[in-house]
Every structure is written in structure tokens, then in C-alpha cells.
Amino acid sequence: MNQTIQLVIPMTGVGQRFVNRGYSDIKPLIQTGIGSMLAGVLRNFQSITSPICIVSDSHPQKSRLKDEIIRLRPQARIVEIEAHKKGPSFAVWCAKEYLDLELPTIVNYCDFSGIWSEDKLIKNLTEQDGLILTYQGFHPHRFRSNAYAYVKKDINDIVTEVQEKSSFTNDPSKEEASSGTYGFKTARIMLSAIQTQLDQNISHNEEFYTSLTYIPMIRDGLEVKTMLIDKFFQWGTPDDLEDFIFWSELAAKKTNPKCPSDTTNGLILAAGSGTRLAQSTDTPKPLIKVFGKLLWEYSAELINSCLNKSIFIRSRDQAEYVSTNCPNILKLSINSSTNSQAESAKKGLEMMKPNDLPVHVLAADNIIQQVKISDVTEKLKASDLIVWVTKNYAIAKLYPNHFSWVDVDSMNQITKVYFKEGSPNKESFSILGNFTFKSMQIAEKVIGEVISQSLSSTETYLDHVIEYCLKKNLKVSAFIVNKSFSIGTEEEWSTSTYWQESFSALGQFE
């Protein structure tokens, strides 16, 4: 048993955002893709065998939570306190009688994990009065929110200010944000600061955050420093967690579910140059690798059950790869770039063997999980065109003018399209770039007419087909994808790189 460091994990919160999303488990028990949230916390503290876990005495899942604690750390000390909504520092205060006042102490929130050196943390813990584990630079969860704790330091790297739920500047990536791991030279120092925090009501929205416990310490002249961690995994909201699970499944090489043979055509558009990624890579976009697979192969998995499968390409390297590794996909190659996405689709369709079957036209830069192409085909019974869309794509919400959007009614019929202009409707869906047409004839006709009518003053996208079909009173419906990712912008490239580096470092799937 390690008696040199105290680890305290408050777990008394309700996790209301998860409850609202329909999660039935209490937050520490929610699965993340690499185990429960609590397991993700404890993996960072391998040397601490007897953490102090604070739980609510009245939570209906208390028994299950206690079982999970003991499963992970048989020698853990479980402290039950009355339910409250006063934040983690208040929970620690309620458990103060269980703390050794002279031991170095770590308070760790229960809804995140990361990668850092435990040995370095333990060494640094006793070299100053307080130690905040922080992260800096690009982090994907910042696309959704900036509501985290941030620190400000002087020229000697001493923390001078701590602020909850907001950065100090307009560029949070250049600041150090708190991960949720808080160290104190002794529990005595910590509890003294918490007492002042409670007495002076140093809180945010009536919650006593442990980040704010350092404010009395700083005022009293105690030394607080930070330790930057290598990677940070945020699970504090359902969207953050679901992003992490999405990437964990890619890392684990999970594929889309198998589906029965689909009597349709599948066409992947992979002739683009990917110029928007020029600052990050000179690799043609379809040849970018994500967890060991070429980007377009994720789309190839989707159309694997289609009767006829084709890919429209322009690169000799791509053609050789397709022939060698995907012999069942017909390659349709050209020697130069097309002028637009719509023109690529038109040329690709013209090069395919004519038939009366439906056709799925897929972008080569989408990664879509847990979708059966047969489910999309089924919707063609009541539609002439199906547009693949999603609702919770963080980068689209952050840069709405970079995406096209549609309004969808209660019957999943598309009623309006907003082309690269954002949407005034918060309930709108962003377009993924995949389209399913009732027949090849319909696809060739509407795409050809959109190009000839030049409805766009710039590049003609397949997105423009939606407006054309609506004006012609064709039935246009939405196929809603719950989780997807695209690599078409610098932000998306950075996100993909971050997660690949993270899971490689985790070593969970190697």
C-alpha cells in the first residue's frame, strides 16, 4: 500500500448532462471505449493502491459504484457523504477526517483521463505548495466549449491567477488550462485553503471547484506551479465522450456492421486535390492514412455490399493501390483534376456501366461508423434523393459558413438548404457530402442540369443538387448519421493527428 501520496476522487455529482442525454449509469461508471471513466482516472495513478473515493450516500447506483471501485482498487477507502450540489472541494471538505494532514495530496476529478508521467507528478508535488496539471495547444474538445479553468503565471512560472469556465484571452490554445488534477504539498495546506474558500464563498455558480481552492493560497503567498501533461482526454459532456469513443473504435480497427448484398451502385469520388490541407501535408487527400487505412477506404467499407463498386480517381499511385488491395472496386481514372465535385460525380457516373439501379455517391474524405448501406437504400422507397447529414459535428458548428446545412421536418424530409452560409436554425443538420439517388438516370440528369445551369458562381458542389431537386418537387429526405468525421480542413487534420498520436501513446490497441 502506498502511504506517501493521498489520492482523493470526489464522485458525488449527478452528471445532469448525461442524464438529459439518456445515459443510465452514474458518470464514473460510464464506459469510454477504454473502460469506465473511473478506470480511466486510475490508470494514471498505478502506484496509488488505496485512493480515497467520495461517493453520495443516497445515489441509487451507489452499490454498483462501490463494486467498481473495489474491482479497480481492492484497498480503496470509500467515504459516503450526503448528496449535495456544492462542487468537488465541498465534497473533499466533508471527507476531511479521513485524510492524513501531513501527506502530499492529489484531488482528481472523475470525468477525464490523459497521458503524463506519474513519477514526475509525485516528484513535483512536494517541490511547491500547490501543483496544477495543465494542458496547452491544440485540443479537439475546445471546438465545442471553452468553459474550463485557466491559469495565469508570472515570469518565474508561478501561478498568479486562476479562473473558472473562461480563458483570460481570446486565444485559449496559448494558455494553460486545468486538466482536473490538483496537487497540494500536504492535506493540511489544502484543507486550510478549502476552509477559506468556503468561508469567503470563492465559487462559480454556487459550486466550489478545486481550481478555485488555489486562490486563497496565492493570496497568502504560497507557491503554486503547473505541470504540463502530454495528452488530455475530456469526458465531461456526452459530446466529448462520444467523440473519444468514436476515435477509440477507429483505433481498435472496428469496422461498420456487415449487411446483406445491396442491389445498388456505389461510387467514391477521390479525384480531388485537397488544396485546403496544403499547409499540413502534401499527400493527396485520399492517400492520407488514418489508423493505418487510407482515408477513402472508410468509404469503400460502406459500399462493400453494393452490387457494383467504383472509385473515381486521378492519381497513378491510387490506381495501383486500388488494383492491388481492393480488386473488387472498379477504378475510373482520369489524368487531370475536374473543376468541381459535381463534375467529378458526372464524369464518374458516365464512366460506370449504365443500369437502372440506385447509386450511392460518396465523398472520399468521410469516416462514418455504425452505418449499413442497406439502411440508406431502404429509404429510397419514399425518396428520389437521400442526403447524408449529421447534427452534432463540432467543427461545422464552429465554422458554419464552411458547410452546407439543411432543415429537416418530422418525417425526415428536407425542406430547405443553406449553401455555405450557416443556418439560422439551431435544429439544422450539416451535410456530409454523401448522396444517394433513386437511380443512375436521376443522378446523371439532375447533376448534369445543375452544372449546365451554373447555379453556383464558384465551384459546383453536389450540395447544389438539393436545391434543384426541391424546386423540381422531387422527394428529398435526410439520412441522419450519428457519428462521423471528415478530413477536409486544417482543423480536421489537426484533430485526426491528435487522436492518432493519443491512441498510439495509450498503446491500448497495438
Describe each PLM feature range.
Residues 1-10, 17-19, 31, 35-107, ...:
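Conserved N-terminal catalytic core of the sugar/cofactor nucleotidyltransferase
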Residues 2-7, 101, 175-266, 428-510:
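Conserved alpha/beta core of the MobA/IspD/sugar-nucleotide pyrophosphorylase nucleotidyltransferase superfamily
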Residues 13, 111, 136, 237, ...:
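Active-site glycine-centered loops adjacent to acidic/histidine catalytic or metal-binding residues
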Residues 23-28, 282-286:
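Short alpha-helical oligomerization interface
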Residues 29, 151-153, 226, 287, ...:
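A structural signal for short hydrophobic beta-strand segments in well-ordered beta-sheet cores
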Residues 93-94, 120, 213, 243, ...:
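Alpha-helical elements of Rossmann-like donor-binding domains used by nucleotide-donor carbohydrate transfer enzymes
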Residues 114-201, 369-453:
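Conserved core of the sugar-phosphate nucleotidyltransferase
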